Amino acid sequence: MKKLTEEQILENLGKFYGYITKYIPTGDRQDKLLEFYKGIEVTLAISPASTKLSHHNCFAGGYVDHVNRVVEASLVLDKVWERFGQKKTYTIEELVFSAINHDLGKMGTNEEPFYLPNDSDWHREKQGAYFKINTNMTHMRVADRSLYYLQQANIPVTENEFLAIKLHDGLYEEANKPYYITYSSDVELKCNLPYILHQADLMASRVETQI
């Protein structure tokens, strides 16, 4: 299992906060985001991005490392879509906000983290499952919990951000089909942000299994 040094974890955390202060304008929303993440900073800093070695970033600090990569990939893909003539109906703030918070549902609190170290030798050795989900937490889909946490923290979310976060898993999530497969231009997604965030997340996750 990959291991980050304490210095690398802190560097990634600083980069994460840097995206908030750079791309979310100074004011109430930035303040609330920083306050929220500072309140769960221990869990934020050391959480993995997944439970198994065969999945992406299954190591302490993997969550923030993944989110940072998704932010970077989103900014690059935004330029790619522009290069090919997209009709842009979202802002860079919306793009970065969605990327920062797309997997927020994988967080818990400092007292009740979503991911816990797996205490089963069999699961670690046979399945590479070094972490497990905290079953004390109410079951929700990751995207739903992400939006729930933002609501609980009174952090405003635009329509574009809501849909990007909700749909970031693309067609890997069965519940997203009615949004992506519509058979009618009248009800198709009116913004490219969900597609861009999904592509960024997919690319980051794939690359993370190879580095």
Whereabouts are the PLM-identified features?
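Divalent metal-dependent catalytic cores for phosphoryl transfer on phosphate-bearing substrates
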Residues: 53-61, 65, 77, 88-210
